[in-house]
Amino acid sequence: MASREGKRRNHNHDDEKLVPLAALISRETKAAKMEKPIVRFGQAAQSRKGEDYVLIKTDSLRVPSNSSTAFSVFAVFDGHNGKAAAVYTRENLLNHVISALPSGLSRDEWLHALPRALVSGFVKTDKEFQSRGETSGTTATFVIVDGWTVTVACVGDSRCILDTKGGSVSNLTVDHRLEDNTEERERVTASGGEVGRLSIVGGVEIGPLRCWPGGLCLSRSIGDMDVGEFIVPVPFVKQVKLSNLGGRLIIASDGIWDALSSEVAAKTCRGLSAELAARQVVKEALRRRGLKDDTTCIVVDIIPPENFQEPPPSPPKKHNNFFKSLLFRKKSNSSNKLSKKLSTVGIVEELFEEGSAMLAERLGSGDCSKESTTGGGIFTCAICQLDLAPSEGISVHAGSIFSTSLKPWQGPFLCTDCRDKKDAMEGKRPSGVKVI
């Protein structure tokens, strides 16, 4: 993930012929105005430790008092070593994300700025929770649905999957388990952590790979101040635009995913309403594995408007594998026209993906940072939103060997505390020295 140059997708697809041009033009005309989808959801859970929490909010507004700017938020927080981190994150993460977004943005600008705001919100939530001196931690899988656009941010192993019409299942998150994620193991060890299994009497090693000190089997989380700064809160973020055929999201804690694969979870609840689907996924996970952990599931259906008429199916193609490989199509330079064409033939358009743990990469250049232009040359910390005088701000690029910027005086800027937090996460100062 740290090696991935995941930015805004910008690729040319000039000669790829999916369907005849006349058919594309006809469908584009019929779908020229994509109405907002209907969003329905269901939730189910079985508790063993009482450390799983969810957030469901369907009435958030990009512009206060303007119902046409509504978006929905769905999140799962799987706590460990107590519930405090999960509860705190549920209560504060959304506000921290929203506070990192500049005001006065259009919808497209808001969606474009959202991935970076999610990074700031996750890191700020972690920093503030650690200042309380509590040692619990939590995963966080945070999903924002705005029209047909789905933006997902995650740390930990509470997976989110997308099931689209036709039975294609895709993961929208990355599991940050040391056992399964080679890149994260390498990042942790490079930052000064040790990765190994629990050793018992006689030197026998048991269980999954863990990070020491602390023994956490995850490489990213919120909280966990007792396990080293190389366990970072910087989320993997993915943003996609669904076709106007819609799709189903399944967001769940590892109590589900330890029992069911993504494909099985999707298949086991097809044809059911969102509410019944969530119950069925939990029921199937318990049937296969029993109640060994908190088991939580949210199902979100993004459904075409009632007056939507599905376009006729395309003629069968000989190269089915090629067509399937185009399910996730990258964004083109001719974005508006091609976007409408892609959506009419049922293709999910990938708008953004990034998984690097390096804040200099994730916070980017200062072009779209939340810098005040009203009075006194005041700047804002890109993470905690603290107002800074120009002499106080430290560029996120300053001293970073990972930065592509040759101008470390450019923004975005961090306050001293957040810069210390960044340095610790990147192994630039000893682990165990906590930022309070």
Swiss-Prot record:
Assigned protein family: Belongs to the PP2C family.
Catalytic activity: O-phospho-L-seryl-[protein] + H2O = L-seryl-[protein] + phosphate; O-phospho-L-threonyl-[protein] + H2O = L-threonyl-[protein] + phosphate
Gene3D superfamilies: PPM-type phosphatase domain
InterPro entries, alphabetized: PP2C, PPM-type-like_dom_sf, PPM-type_phosphatase-like_dom
Keyword field contains RNA-binding: no
An MF annotation (GO) of this entry: metal ion binding
One Pfam family this sequence matches: PP2C
Cofactor(s) annotated in UniProt: Mg(2+); Mn(2+)
E.C. number(s) listed in UniProt: 3.1.3.16
Origin species: Arabidopsis thaliana (Mouse-ear cress)
Residues that, per the record, bind Mn(2+) 1: D78, G79
Keywords: Hydrolase, Magnesium, Manganese, Metal-binding, Protein phosphatase
Protein's UniProt keywords contain Magnesium: yes
Amino-acid positions noted as binding Mn(2+) 2 in the UniProt annotation, renumbered to this chain: D78, D254, D293
Enzyme class: hydrolase
UniProt protein name: Probable protein phosphatase 2C 15
Cofactor comment: Binds 2 magnesium or manganese ions per subunit.
Every PPM-type phosphatase domain range: 30-302
